[in-house]
C-alpha cells in the first residue's frame, strides 16, 4: 500500500459540523482533496459556506443546520443519508468558546453560558454521533472524530464551561470507542491548543505574547495543523486508532 492509497477517501461520505470557517473549513478542503464527498454543515453565514464549497467544487455540498437543536441535527443526518446513502465519517467540530469567568456577577448569564456551551459542544456532538451510528451500522462501520481541546485536560479559569464541555467530549469519544467497536465503528479525538481561527481571535489579540510563551514551538497553530491530523484519522492509516486523543498544541500541554 503506497502513501497515496493510505490517505485515499474516494467514495466516502464525510459530514463536518461547523465547516464554514476555521478548522472545519480546512478539514473539508483536505477531505475533498483526498477524494471524499464532503457535507459542509454550517449555521451562520451562507456566503462563508458557499465560499468553502466553491473552493472544493463538486465534491462538496453545504447543508445548513443548527446542530445544537436536536431536531435540526436529526434532519441534517436524515437528509445526508437520504441523499448519499450513508455517513462514513462524522467530524464533530462545531463549538462555542465564550468568556464566562468565575468572578462574574450575573448568575443568569453564568447559567446561560453553561447551557449554550454544553448544548453545542456536547449534546450536539452526542446527538450527531448517535444518529450517524445508525447509518454506519447498516453500512458495516464508520468513524467518528471529535474536536476537543487542550482545555479538556488543562482547565480554563475564564472559560470553565468550555473546558468542562471538551472534557465531556473526550469521555464521549472513549465511550463510543468501547461500545461501538463491535459494529466496526471507531472514535478518536483531537485536542488542539490555541489555533489561528476566528473563534480564538479575541483571546489571541488580547494575550498573544503570553500564549506563545507557553508553547515550546513558539507559534500559534494553524488550521492545517489540525486538519491534517483529522484527515489521518479518517483515512485507512487511522483504522486501528480507537478511543484516543491526539494533542495538537505545540507542546504547551502534555496529558
What do the predicted segments below correspond to?
Residues 2-5, 154, 231, 242-255:
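Short C-terminal tail/terminal secondary-structure segment
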Residues 13, 20-21:
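Conserved glycine-rich cofactor-binding loop
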Residues 120-138, 177-178, 182, 235:
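Amphipathic alpha-helical dimer-interface segment in Rossmann-like NAD(P)H-dependent oxidoreductases
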Residues 96, 107-126, 141, 145, ...:
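Catalytic Tyr-X3-Lys loop
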Residues 129, 165, 173:
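Active-site helix of classical SDR
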Residues 149:
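Residue(s) in the substrate-gating loop at a strand-loop-helix junction
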Residues 74, 96-115, 138, 158-161, ...:
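Conserved mid-core segment of classical short-chain dehydrogenase/reductases
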Residues 181, 186, 241-243:
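Short, small/polar-rich loop/turn modules that mediate ligand/substrate recognition or access, typified
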Amino acid at each position: 500500500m503506497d502513501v497515496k492509497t493510505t490517505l485515499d477517501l474516494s467514495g466516502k461520505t464525510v459530514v463536518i459540523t461547523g465547516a464554514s470557517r476555521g478548522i472545519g473549513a480546512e478539514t473539508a478542503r483536505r477531505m475533498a482533496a483526498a477524494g471524499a464527498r464532503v457535507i459542509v454543515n454550517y449555521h451562520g453565514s451562507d456566503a462563508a459556506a458557499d465560499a468553502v464549497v466553491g473552493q472544493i467544487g463538486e465534491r462538496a455540498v453545504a447543508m445548513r443546520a443548527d446542530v445544537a437543536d436536536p431536531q435540526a441535527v436529526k434532519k441534517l443526518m436524515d437528509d445526508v443519508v437520504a441523499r448519499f446513502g450513508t455517513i462514513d465519517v462524522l467530524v464533530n467540530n462545531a463549538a462555542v468558546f465564550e468568556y464566562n469567568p468565575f468572578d462574574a456577577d450575573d448568575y443568569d448569564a453564568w447559567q446561560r453560558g453553561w447551557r449554550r456551551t454544553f448544548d453545542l459542544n456536547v449534546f450536539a456532538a452526542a446527538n450527531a454521533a448517535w444518529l450517524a451510528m445508525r447509518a454506519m451500522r447498516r453500512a458495516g462501520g464508520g468513524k467518528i472524530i471529535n474536536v476537543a481541546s487542550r482545555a479538556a485536560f488543562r482547565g480554563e479559569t475564564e472559560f470553565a464551561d468550555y473546558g468542562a464541555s471538551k472534557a465531556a467530549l473526550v469521555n464521549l469519544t472513549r465511550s463510543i470507542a468501547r461500545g461501538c467497536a463491535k459494529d466496526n465503528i471507531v472514535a478518536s479525538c483531537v485536542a488542539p491548543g490555541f489555533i489561528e481561527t476566528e473563534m480564538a481571535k479575541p483571546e489571541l489579540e488580547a494575550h498573544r505574547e503570553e500564549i506563545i510563551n507557553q508553547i515550546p514551538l513558539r507559534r500559534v497553530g494553524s488550521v492545517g495543523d489540525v486538519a491534517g491530523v483529522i484527515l489521518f484519522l479518517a483515512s485507512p492509516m487511522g483504522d486501528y486508532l480507537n478511543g484516543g486523543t491526539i494533542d495538537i498544541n505545540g507542546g504547551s500541554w502534555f496529558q
